Amino acid sequence: MNSSGLLCDNERPRHRPFLIGVSGGTASGKSTVCAKIMELLGQNKVDHHQRKVTIVSQDSFYRVLTPEQKAKALKGQYNFDHPDAFDTEFMCQTLKDIVEGKVVEVPTYDFVTHSRLPEKICVYPADVVLFEGILVFYTQEVRDMFHMKQFVDTDSDVRLSRRVLRDMNRGRDLEQILTQYTTFVKPAFEEFCLPTKKYADVIIPRGVDNMVAINLIVQHIQDILNGDICKWQRGSVNGHNHGRSLKRGVAEHGENPSGSSSNLTKRPLLEPSTRPH
């Protein structure tokens, strides 16, 4: 404790956060969904030291490229959507530290130069941590750390149009963008990302446009912040129970008058996009 009577960062009581994984294809709207959740919870205006909910992106864990790889990346010839593009070991250790309530630093990745910036992002202990990325469910060791898993399901044409606009704003030409998409992005989505959809407790069609889903998830997180987190820390509530209870809530909102379930209810619901590659 310092002279003013306040606890320093390394003296704060540590607690285990509720870890939520948010996956989905490139430009599906994962980052925007997370940002909307933060906004609705009123956490986006709270000082980073005091936030009860925080966001960490898998983008921070892209590997440092060799000169040869960087040259390919600048030509749109490097596969950023393959599992090997990420430093999985570093990512796993960082998540373990977060779950243990530690203060961690994660890299800032520059998608224009394809390199890590000197500035790092400091992630402080929070009650709920949203970890978003295209392949956050791919590795079992990472997947098993999540207490809840959400998949943002957005139409492929919408994702492509968003990606084209985003990458052109970064100075890339249309031909390079489309070549990279057909050569790397689309095949990698179908091989590595889409199959992990089956692990999701919550599926969010149309992303941030689906405010019914967003509001249900926000309410669920609010319940955790209001006390359920204490229950699951004591062992009476676990991550799978949280996922099932949310599914039931979504199903109740998604039933048709005939009593049959809409597409919304096949699995619960969440999204516009700031995917790098």
From Swiss-Prot:
GO molecular function (one): ATP binding
**Reactions the enzyme catalyzes:** uridine + ATP = UMP + ADP + H(+); cytidine + ATP = CMP + ADP + H(+)
In which pathway does this enzyme or protein participate?
Answer: Pyrimidine metabolism; CTP biosynthesis via salvage pathway; CTP from cytidine: step 1/3; Pyrimidine metabolism; UMP biosynthesis via salvage pathway; UMP from uridine: step 1/1
**Carries keyword Endoplasmic reticulum?**
no
Binding annotation for ATP: 24-32, 209
Q: Binding residues for substrate, per the UniProt record?
A: 81, 109, 114, 163, 172, 180
Q: What class of enzyme is it?
A: transferase
Enzyme Commission number: 2.7.1.48
Which SUPFAM superfamilies does this UniProt record tie to the protein? P-loop containing nucleoside triphosphate hydrolases
Record keywords, A-Z: ATP-binding, Kinase, Nucleotide-binding, Transferase
Keyword Isomerase on entry: no
In the UniProt record, which is one GO cellular component term?
Answer: cytoplasm
Region of interest called Disordered, as start-end residue ranges on this chain: 241-277
Any single biological process term in GO: CTP salvage
Q: Cite the Pfam families for this sequence.
A: PRK
**What does the protein in this record do?**
Phosphorylates uridine and cytidine to uridine monophosphate and cytidine monophosphate. Does not phosphorylate deoxyribonucleosides or purine ribonucleosides. Can use ATP or GTP as a phosphate donor.
Q: Which family does it belong to?
A: Belongs to the uridine kinase family.
Quote the protein name from its UniProt record.
Answer: Uridine-cytidine kinase 1
Q: Which gene encodes it?
A: uck1
